Amino acid sequence: CSAVADDTLPQNCRQVKYSLCRIAFDFQNERLGEVVDTLYNARMEGQSVSFPRLSPDGRFLAFTLHDFGNFSIWHKEADLYMLDLLTSRKYPLDVFNSEEAESYHSWSGNGRWMVFSSRRIDGLYTRLFIGYVDSEGVGHKPFLLPQKDPLTYYDALMFSYNIPELMRSAVTVDACRLAGCLRSGKKSNLR
């Protein structure tokens, strides 16, 4: 994502809008390309993009669209959108969206499911919903993340889920070792 530099922040924070851009990457040489392609132009279209996430098959790009900035969970108008990278068609994931904020999202490994954060239940707390996405990029009715006793669990929960990620297995990497690798800035195989 890219936005025009603004020296008048934070006063004009509502004017900051992020465009969605694409640039080639050479994996072998670890270099970015030189041509930047703007997929969503915030200045022309009027809203801001955050959390672009590519489907595992590379066909679809899901993202959050909201009025300004990049912290979409605080924007009631924030909705999930999809971009078909074969046709360049951009469209809202209407069945995933509500009157409240939908924000961070994550694809399943097979690209047929998404988990996303939503405030649809009460407008205050972020809960996780899971929805099916078919091969044409159409979302189907999502459901609240199941719990053993959902009424007790969700009524008593005083925390929000903000950054859901679907995992294939349990995380087995030692947290201290991971932090050390991140701080070093060096490539490492943590298996």
Which residue ranges define each predicted feature?
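Sequence signature of WD/YWTD-type beta-propeller architectures
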Residues: 1-191
